[in-house]
Amino acid sequence: MHKVQSLQDPFLNVLRRERVPVFIYLINGIKLQGEIESFDKFVILLRNTVNQMIYKHAISTIVPSRVVSYYVGRAGNHTTF
């Protein structure tokens, strides 16, 4: 059995590594802004004037401030968002 690679990990990693400013919309309508400092399976650490730990289950949408490209899967499929 092969391990299925997550789509969100490469996307979040590019945003973190390149320090791309993002807007994060929560399911309750709140809009947060900052740079992704770190993330794991359950949370994203967002840095602005303060650090905020955001649970992924509370997130509706993540919008980068610019176009980002990243690779997904073993075949190295190139994706632009």
UniProtKB/Swiss-Prot annotation:
Keywords for this protein: RNA-binding, Stress response
CDD domains assigned: Hfq (cd01716)
Keyword Flavoprotein: no
Residue intervals of the Sm domain: 9-68
One of the record's GO molecular function terms: RNA binding
Cross-referenced Pfam families: Hfq (PF17209)
Gene Ontology BP terms: regulation of DNA-templated transcription; regulation of RNA stability; regulation of translation, ncRNA-mediated
InterPro entries to which the protein is assigned, alphabetical: Hfq (IPR005001), LSM_dom_sf (IPR010920), Sm (IPR047575)
One GO CC term, this protein: cytosol
PROSITE patterns: SM
Record's signal peptide: none
Purpose of the protein: RNA chaperone that binds small regulatory RNA (sRNAs) and mRNAs to facilitate mRNA translational regulation in response to envelope stress, environmental stress and changes in metabolite concentrations. Also binds with high specificity to tRNAs.
Membership in a protein family: Belongs to the Hfq family.
Quaternary structure, from the entry: Homohexamer.
HAMAP family listed in its UniProt record: Hfq (MF_00436)
Designated name of the protein: RNA-binding protein Hfq
Organism: Blochmanniella pennsylvanica (strain BPEN)
Lineage: Bacteria, Pseudomonadati, Pseudomonadota, Gammaproteobacteria, Enterobacterales
Gene: hfq
